[in-house]
Amino acid sequence: QPWSADAAPRRADLAVLTSPADCEAAAAELGFPLIVKPAHEGSSIGMAKVDSAAELNKALEDARAYDSDVLVEAWVRGPEYTVAIVDGRALPSIRLKTPNAFYDFEAKYQSNSTEYLCPAGLDDADEQALRALALKAFEAVGCQGWGRVDVMRDEHGDWQLLEVNTVPGMTDHSLVPMAAKADGDGPRTLVLAHGFGCWVLRPVIDK
């Protein structure tokens, strides 16, 4: 795994399920609760938190409607953050707060209770450490240009990398523009133009 090879913190407590026979082994290795998600889906589609073998088998069946490969990870207790990366620079982190069991599809697109905190409420040392980790993780898997890195902070205070989002939303209410605005770039100045094989920033003159 590129993250492990690059000596960045990585959640080792992860397995890939390809058949119901894998569920028992994964549950024995990782324990409950678990989070189940299709390997190649976005927007938390097909994701579920499970607390028993019966729920795990049902979640696998549901997730396989979206992808033949399904990831199962040990549940991490703690706050979730996301860090936008733009042109080799980590932007201010955003803390994601939801009353739901996790930051699921409903929390992202339908709920009025989800909170996005930017600044995220971290002290300066933790904020800089999180940004550095996110940028390192982004580059370790060969990403360039722009994206987002999702991270959780576990009950011991350690950062746990979740994933890189290589196609984050770019609407006026999406998280990358939110972080850019906190960093001093308004929505009219954050314009991405494709060139030289990657996404790069281009300035815009407001008229």
Language model features with spans:
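Active-site nucleotide/adenylate-binding loops and adjacent lid/helix of ATP-dependent enzymes
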Residues: 1-79
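ATP-dependent carboxylate activation and anion-phosphoryl transfer catalytic cores
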Residues: 8, 123-199, 207
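Short small-residue beta-strand/loop micro-motif enriched in glycine and branched aliphatics
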Residues: 44, 114-117, 171-176
